[in-house]
């Protein structure tokens, strides 16, 4: 009789534990998949939010370029006496602009700081002028350089226009990025080891927690060259990569609408999967406790039905 009770106990116990284990495995697979999808969307939305904040900052701080173009498009006569005070006003009113200036196809150049070029200096050959022409009336955000006076990272933001007399010209702003970087460092959640970085449409790194990765005028660091191209590969594959600090991480990238820049959010794998791992641990604990309870019930039940 004892043998029968033992065998019945083991039989029912194996059935109960087996069913619980199968249920846990199936539940963990589907739950982990659902959590991973939710996590992906969450980090995508976070990157898109950061990108929208960058775009808002850029539009707010480069609005004077659009305003200056509108002012000049309404003018039929190019009069330095009336144009210079306007450029000076735009320069003085924007704390993030080093200067706002304008160049015309006849090589006339008017600078908002009052600077006047030497004879023979040709504004139409400057990159900000030629790049704005190539952009066809859209604002062009140039590659970064370091200002010789302030040591800050600067970009040129330029836009082509035509005056009322159909003379071509380009408005240019030299924009400091330090305030933008301060804002991004403030809003980016780094509590789990995440960080964000920014690169422009040419791939030049503008902002990165590793100062060695940031572009300057003499040394433009391209995102495709960093960590053996690991950033670009991870963006394409959506798989984890080994970061410069040796840790496995995921990344999500979002486009900054008005400039073509990219905002990239980098998150450690451990933080990325923490919710799924916590859920799996809960399932394991529940399964173990359920198995213990089932075992006790099976033993009691088997004992009752095998009594003489």
Regions found by a protein language model. Give the residues of each.
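Extreme N-terminal signal-anchor transmembrane helix of membrane signaling/transducer proteins, especially
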Residues: 2-33, 37, 284-293, 297
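Solvent-exposed, extracytoplasmic
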Residues: 80-93, 170, 174-214
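GAF sensory domains
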Residues: 110-120, 206-225
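Extracellular/periplasmic juxtamembrane segments that couple receptor/chemosensory ectodomains to their
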Residues: 212, 218-281
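Extracytoplasmic/periplasmic sensory segments of membrane signal-transduction proteins
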Residues: 41-48, 53-138
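Cytoplasm-proximal transmembrane signaling helix
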Residues: 12-17, 262-264, 269-308
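Juxtamembrane interface helices immediately C-terminal to a transmembrane segment
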Residues: 9-10, 27-57, 79, 272, ...
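Extracytoplasmic/periplasmic ligand-binding sensor regions of membrane-associated signaling proteins
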Residues: 92-96, 110-187, 241-243
């Amino acid at each position: 009789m004892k043998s029968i009770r033992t065998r019945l106990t083991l039989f029912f116990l194996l059935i109960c534990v087996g069913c619980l284990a199968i249920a846990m495995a199936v539940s963990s697979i589907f739950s982990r998949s659902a959590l991973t999808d939710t996590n992906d969307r969450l980090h995508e939305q976070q990157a898109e939010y950061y990108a929208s904040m960058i775009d808002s900052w850029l539009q707010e701080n480069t609005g004077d370029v659009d305003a200056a173009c509108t002012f000049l498009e309404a003018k039929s006569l190019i009069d330095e006496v009336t144009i210079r005070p306007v450029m000076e006003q735009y320069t003085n009113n924007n704390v993030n602009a080093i200067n706002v200036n304008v160049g015309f196809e006849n090589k006339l150049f008017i600078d908002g700081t009052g600077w006047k070029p030497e004879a023979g200096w040709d504004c139409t050959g400057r990159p900000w002028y030629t790049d704005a022409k190539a952009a066809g009336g859209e604002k062009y955000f140039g590659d970064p350089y370091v200002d010789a006076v302030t040591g800050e990272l600067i970009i040129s933001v330029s836009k082509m226009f035509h005056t009322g007399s159909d003379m071509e010209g380009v408005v240019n702003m030299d924009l400091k990025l330090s305030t933008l970087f301060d804002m991004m460092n403030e809003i980016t959640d780094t509590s789990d080891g995440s960080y964000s970085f920014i690169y422009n449409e040419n791939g030049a790194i503008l902002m990165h927690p590793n100062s060695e990765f940031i572009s300057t005028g003499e040394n433009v660091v391209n995102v495709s060259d960093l960590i053996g191209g690991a950033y670009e590969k991870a963006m394409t594959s959506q798989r984890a990569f080994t970061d410069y600090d040796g840790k496995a991480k995921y990344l999500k990238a979002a486009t900054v609408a008005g400039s073509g820049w990219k905002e990239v959010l980098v998150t450690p794998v451990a933080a990325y999967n923490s919710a799924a791992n916590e859920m799996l641990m809960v399932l394991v604990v529940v399964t173990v406790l359920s198995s213990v309870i089932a075992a006790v019930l099976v033993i009691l039940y088997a004992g009752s039905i095998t009594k003489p």
